[in-house]
């Protein structure tokens, strides 16, 4: 099973070894787009030749933070692919898990993404959703399947009609979360987890 909505990975400065998230998607058989800056395009294109397409934002080293690349993914999903939603992920996610009976189980395909999409698509007021970090969910702690109205980082499923966009040079995940929480509810899954390097469950933002 693969995600219904397009998946994007933003990456910079990892062309030599390749983004971890892309390697995970190769193992899981998940198609994805890789968004990079112009000066690194050739390296990424050669290194990640299994990507659906390597996309390029307008300029290199613009100093505006990763929000510009995230917005470029958003525009591509909405205006080119005409998609209702899109996934956007950081490039340093080492693996994905599902939580069952408080046990983290490593996934073997994209079913966790499709399950998250199916859940979110039941509602008209979910603007942003995403997975939680696996290190917040230890085996012996009580967990609920999802959490509303909280911050979402690193792995996000975004409604393309959401009126708020990525902004700010730093902490753009937090800024988007706070912007969306003004009008929407957020949903974070606790059934699906992602394992991030140096930085899961499911979260959403919903409109009241």
Label for each model-derived stretch:
Residues 36-89, 94-108:
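Active-site-proximal specificity loops/subdomain of glycosyltransferases
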């Amino acid at each position: 099973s693969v995600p219904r909505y397009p998946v994007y990975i933003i990456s910079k400065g990892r062309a030599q070894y390749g983004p971890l998230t892309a390697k995970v998607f190769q193992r899981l058989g998940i198609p994805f787009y890789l968004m990079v800056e112009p000066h690194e395009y050739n390296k990424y294109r050669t290194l990640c030749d299994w990507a659906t397409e390597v996309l390029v934002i307008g300029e290199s080293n613009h100093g505006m933070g990763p929000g510009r690349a995230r917005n470029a993914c958003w525009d591509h999903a909405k205006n080119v692919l005409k998609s209702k939603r899109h996934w956007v992920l950081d490039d340093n996610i080492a693996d994905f898990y599902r939580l069952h009976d408080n046990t983290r189980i490593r996934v073997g395909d994209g079913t966790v993404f499709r399950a998250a999409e199916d859940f979110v698509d039941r509602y008209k007021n979910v603007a942003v959703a995403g997975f939680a970090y696996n290190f917040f969910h230890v085996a012996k702690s009580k967990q609920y399947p999802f959490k509303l109205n909280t911050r979402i980082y690193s792995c996000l499923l975004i409604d393309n009609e959401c009126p708020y966009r990525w902004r700010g040079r730093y902490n753009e995940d937090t800024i988007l979360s706070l912007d969306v929480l003004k009008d929407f509810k957020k949903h974070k899954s606790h059934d699906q987890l992602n394992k991030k390097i140096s930085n899961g469950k499911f979260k959403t933002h919903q409109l009241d």
